[in-house]
A protein has these predicted regions:
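RNA pseudouridine synthases
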Residues: 59, 109, 113-138
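A short secondary-structure junction signal
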Residues: 66-67, 94-96, 102, 123-128, ...
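N-terminal non-catalytic cap/leader segment that marks the start of a structured domain
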Residues: 1-80, 173, 238-240, 258-277
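Residue-level recognition of short, solvent-exposed, well-ordered loop/turn junctions
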Residues: 55, 107-109, 215, 232-233
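Catalytic-pocket segment enriched in acidic/His residues
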Residues: 35-36, 43-47, 63, 144-277
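Structural signature of FAD isoalloxazine-binding scaffolds in flavoprotein oxidoreductases
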Residues: 73-92, 108, 238-243
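A generic local secondary-structure boundary/capping motif
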Residues: 43-45, 70-72, 97-106, 120-127, ...
Length: 277
């Protein structure tokens, strides 16, 4: 089932998509409230409302090699390497990716993302997927030069709109062997499978839960395959994940970029008005 978070003229809602219709829900984990609306009449928003965004770095061996970070001897990591992105990074499918003036090396990392359904703390890998609401596509946008030069990754990973997510959640999906592809201007740049992860989704979630409580709506990015590369102003980037669909965004000059923070109701409403003119 595809679950969407959307904007209509009476506010922001959650719903389930069946064909071209959305059945409105009482909340992210809610029940149908008797209202329906055509999918064509709404603006889709990022399908999550996280308090925290947790990311896995270097979860594909070939990506470690392409970054030149493979340890001497070729040993793979024994534990997931984690970092955080601020919730200010969250944007949706169709939003622009801003190219900041302070970086000369903006890069893409296409990823499978996980949205948490219920509070999870200290769970096993066998239990972990029971706490998942659904799966979606994401881009971990990275200012690679600042990631490498700064003491911490805050500037390199957490600028505004550096985490496009969408277009919806797929709630009935096995994440263990899915195709993950990233295209830039129609050319395939990344072509991997989740079965190539060093740490599968269930293990990642269980590991995080040992020391950090994840709550309903939180977002976990599970790592990127090899093939990451540079973005330029005007580029169209698409992340296609088997069983989910396609996340699509365009890179724009920072001063020209159009995007809405996930809780920016004024900007979201203006966008809906502009779409219907």
């Amino acid at each position: 089932m595809r679950r969407v978070r959307y904007l209509s003229y009476d506010g922001v809602h959650w719903g389930d998509v069946d064909g071209g219709m959305i059945t409105r829900l009482s909340g992210m984990n809610g029940h149908p409230d008797g209202n329906e609306i055509p999918l064509s009449e709404v603006a889709l928003l990022p399908p999550c409302e996280p308090a925290i965004i947790v990311c896995v770095g270097r979860n594909y061996a070939e990506h470690i090699r392409e970054l030149g970070n493979m340890p001497q001897g070729g040993d793979l990591p024994s534990e997931p390497g984690l970092f955080l992105k601020g919730v200010n990074t969250l944007s949706g499918s169709g939003d622009d990716i801003p190219y900041p003036s302070w970086t000369q090396d903006l890069q893409f990392e296409g990823e499978l993302a996980v949205v948490i359904a219920d509070t999870m703390r200290d769970v096993t890998a066998d239990e972990a997927l029971d706490y998942v609401l659904g799966y979606t596509c994401a881009v971990d946008v990275t200012a690679r030069d600042k990631q490498r030069s700064d003491l911490q990754w805050v500037r390199g990973k957490s600028a505004d709109a550096f985490c496009p997510v969408g277009p919806w959640l797929e709630t009935d999906l096995d994440p263990t062997d899915l195709s993950v592809r990233t295209l830039v201007n129609g050319e395939v740049k990344q072509d991997g499978r989740t079965s190539d992860m060093i740490f599968p989704v269930a293990e990642v979630l269980a590991y995080i839960s040992k020391f950090m409580t994840l709550r309903s709506g939180d977002l976990v990015l599970t790592g990127t395959p090899d093939g990451v590369g540079k973005l330029q102003v005007g580029d169209r980037i698409e992340v296609e994940i088997e069983g989910i669909g396609t996340l699509s965004n365009q890179v724009a000059h920072e001063s020209d970029a159009s995007f809405a923070m996930f809780d920016d109701r004024e900007e979201l409403s203006a966008r809906l008005d502009a779409r219907d003119r």
